[in-house]
């Protein structure tokens, strides 16, 4: 599990969106399993077995008017087709049932609108959406934001289990306890630049914050330069 730490404005999300193909980039390379890959759009990322759980699940994650089944299956429609146009409803229901049990999603029916679920269950549905594609790299941007303590623990367990299965987890978190408790290695950013790496066993609030504020200008120094 690799964490991307930094203060608001460090551009951690922008970096991950660039890797996933949501943002254009003019420099840098992406390597997966020792091979350079070229990602210009999300479809390229998905083909290279990369998934992205976005920061704001309501704005860019869930499709609120659609059902839980639709939200889980939307990223893997090619595998769920029955012919060139039709979808295989049986496969979709099997996919939903498997993930409902695996992720402990509390939902009365696959046809339930996702907007009626709790924040924690919505987040688990979104994780299930990407796991249906069996990604090798899973980018999680603020995976426990806005959910209760019980749901946080469940998602921590899911993340830990995915790491045990050999998935590469890249996590962005603004919670210091989450960064220190979950990460094997922490990359710290400040003002769009990487300021350092810290092994998980050595990560403390003090050394993370020192790197996260490395390029910040003191108010008095900024005033003197005006």
Residue ranges: model-predicted function:
Residues 1-226:
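Glycine-rich phosphate-binding loops of nucleotide-dependent enzymes
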């Amino acid at each position: 599990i690799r964490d991307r730490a930094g203060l608001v404005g460090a551009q951690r999300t922008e970096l991950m969106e660039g890797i996933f193909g949501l943002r254009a980039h003019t420099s840098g390379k992406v390597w997966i399993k020792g091979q350079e890959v070229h990602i210009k759009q999300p479809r390229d990322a998905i083909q290279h077995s990369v998934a992205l759980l976005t920061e704001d699940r309501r704005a860019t994650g869930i499709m609120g008017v659609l059902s839980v089944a639709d939200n889980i299956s939307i990223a893997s429609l090619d595998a769920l087709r029955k012919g060139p146009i039709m979808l295989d409803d049986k496969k979709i229901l099997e996919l939903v049932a498997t993930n409902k049990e695996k992720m402990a999603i509390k939902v009365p029916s696959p046809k339930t609108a996702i907007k009626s679920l709790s924040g924690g269950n919505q987040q688990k549905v979104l994780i299930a959406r990407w796991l249906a594609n069996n990604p090798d790299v899973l980018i999680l941007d603020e995976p426990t934001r806005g959910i209760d303590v019980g749901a946080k623990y469940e998602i921590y367990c899911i993340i830990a289990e995915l790491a045990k299965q050999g998935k590469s987890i890249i996590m962005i978190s603004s919670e210091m306890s989450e960064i220190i408790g979950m990460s094997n290695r922490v990359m710290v950013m400040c003002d769009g630049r990487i300021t350092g790496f810290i092994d998980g066993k050595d990560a403390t609030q003090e050394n993370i914050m020192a790197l996260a504020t490395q390029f910040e200008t003191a108010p008095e120094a900024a005033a003197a330069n005006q």
